[in-house]
Amino acid sequence: MSNESIKAEQDLIQEGVESEVSTEEASLIDELTQANFRIEELEQLLADALAKVEEQKDSVIRAAAEVDNIRRRAAMDVEKANKFALEKFANELLPVLDNMERALQGTNPQDETTKALFEGVELTQKSFLTAVAKFGVKPIDPQGQAFNPDQHQAIGMQPSAEYPANTVMLVMQKGYELNSRLLRPAMVMVSQGGPSQESASINIEA
């Protein structure tokens, strides 16, 4: 076989090998391209899934917060209802307490004929006040205290050498509160002070 024939045969073999290699390379490139596309698709699906998870997590957190707020408001409403449910009933009891107070004021404890009555009414009043105090009802008796417009209702003012100005000198009717909430203000007479206090006031201003 001549050299030319050998060379021609080698060239054919090389071309065949190169063609086969090119085909395999093209196939590998195509597979890699498809794999990259699939990876991108999977990454996008994963990103979408994570976004949905975050969205659902936020929804769950918001829902839990709303449930907690509703539960807290409901508890406050129940507490408020329980605290002041007796308000109407307590107001109905005030005339009874007033009548017992007037009965004590109109009875002389030193008089043997009325002493037993006084002691009986006094004992009943104490028991009654103890009972209603368990439900938060307490009397407001501001005798000798500074006038407080939030708890006292002044029915007038009078000069007094005994009580300083703007001091409750006489309680006409006790007030009452329910769990620190005013049921009825105390009806009071307020001191204007005495002449000496008026002079002192003038001297201070001078």
From Swiss-Prot:
Any one GO molecular-function label of the UniProt entry: adenyl-nucleotide exchange factor activity
Pfam families for this protein: GrpE
Keyword annotations: Chaperone, Cytoplasm, Stress response
Locations listed in the record: Cytoplasm
GO cellular component, one term: cytosol
UniProt entry tagged with the keyword Magnesium: no
GO biological process per UniProt: protein folding
SUPFAM superfamilies: Coiled-coil domain of nucleotide exchange factor GrpE (SSF58014), Head domain of nucleotide exchange factor GrpE (SSF51064)
Coiled-coil intervals, chain numbering: none
Similarity section: Belongs to the GrpE family.
Biological function: Participates actively in the response to hyperosmotic and heat shock by preventing the aggregation of stress-denatured proteins, in association with DnaK and GrpE. It is the nucleotide exchange factor for DnaK and may function as a thermosensor. Unfolded proteins bind initially to DnaJ; upon interaction with the DnaJ-bound protein, DnaK hydrolyzes its bound ATP, resulting in the formation of a stable complex. GrpE releases ADP from DnaK; ATP binding to DnaK triggers the release of the substrate protein, thus completing the reaction cycle.
Subunit architecture: Homodimer.
Protein name: Protein GrpE
